[in-house]
């Protein structure tokens, strides 16, 4: 069997989830900056565009009828309604990227991850990022100085339910040191790429094996 080739492999879907404040955003931003051949999946949303946002960069902003048509027609891999606005992952760009050997990064919650599992489980490598302690999570949320005390309290309550789903992920990363956690995330990506390349080579080998067996058995 030939050596695994990155150009021959199918792309992978790297799914990263965490409670707010665990460091997921920093880790994924660094990954996109330092790794090649991986892009962040851009969601569609029905909410209004904020002044600082760029259509096609932060989100694809669409009207509700278009979103409904995509959802009902199987055009979304996952979707959710949040505070009266709908968000979803378009199917076609992801499938095209994977077929071309390009990896896709998903920054979504456990509910979105479940939907992705149902759609394309064989392509997914999932990672759940945990804080080193409850106290540290609270400190990180407070240090950001972005949210009121009520919102921080709500995020901490939400973290309880979110963390309860850690067993649904392929990998769990305790983010107690950013550099070490980032190195681990890069290794998880590298391992996923290698396995995908090995599957591609194995598929070619098995196809030839079956062809030869059919010829011999005829």
Model-derived regions, located:
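Extreme N-terminal, non-catalytic leader segments
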Residues: 1-13, 36
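NTP-dependent small-molecule kinase module
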Residues: 2-4, 146-147, 161-218
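P-loop (Walker A) phosphate-binding loop of NTP-binding proteins
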Residues: 17-19
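Conserved lysine of the Walker
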Residues: 24
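Post-Walker A alpha-helix
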Residues: 27-28
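Short glycine-/polar-rich loops that comprise or flank the Walker A/P-loop
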Residues: 36-38, 120-125, 167-169
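Short beta-strand-centered segment that lines the nucleotide-binding/catalytic pocket of NTP-utilizing
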Residues: 36-49
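ATP-dependent NMP and nucleoside kinases share a basic, alpha-helical "lid"
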Residues: 65-75, 89-146, 163
């Amino acid at each position: 069997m030939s050596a695994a080739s990155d150009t021959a492999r199918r792309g992978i879907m790297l799914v990263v989830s965490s409670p707010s404040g665990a460091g997921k955003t920093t880790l994924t931003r660094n990954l996109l900056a330092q790794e090649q051949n991986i892009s962040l999946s851009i969601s569609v949303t029905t909410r209004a565009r904020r002044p600082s946002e760029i259509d096609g960069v932060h989100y694809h902003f669409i009207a509700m009828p278009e979103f409904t048509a995509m959802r009902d027609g199987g055009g979304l891999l996952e979707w959710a309604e949040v505070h009266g606005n709908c968000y979803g992952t378009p199917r076609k760009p992801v499938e095209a990227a994977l077929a071309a050997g390009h990896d896709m990064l998903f920054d979504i919650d456990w509910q979105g991850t479940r939907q992705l599992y149902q759609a394309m489980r064989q392509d997914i490598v999932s990672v759940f990022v945990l804080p080193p302690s409850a106290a540290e999570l609270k400190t990180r949320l407070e240090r950001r100085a972005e949210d009121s005390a009520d919102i921080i309290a709500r995020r901490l309550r939400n973290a309880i339910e979110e963390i309860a789903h850690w067993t649904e992920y392929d990998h769990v990363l305790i983010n107690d040191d950013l550099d070490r956690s980032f190195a681990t995330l890069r290794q998880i990506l590298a391992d996923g790429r290698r396995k995908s390349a090995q599957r591609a080579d194995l598929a070619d080998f098995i196809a030839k094996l079956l062809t030869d067996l059919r010829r011999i058995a005829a």
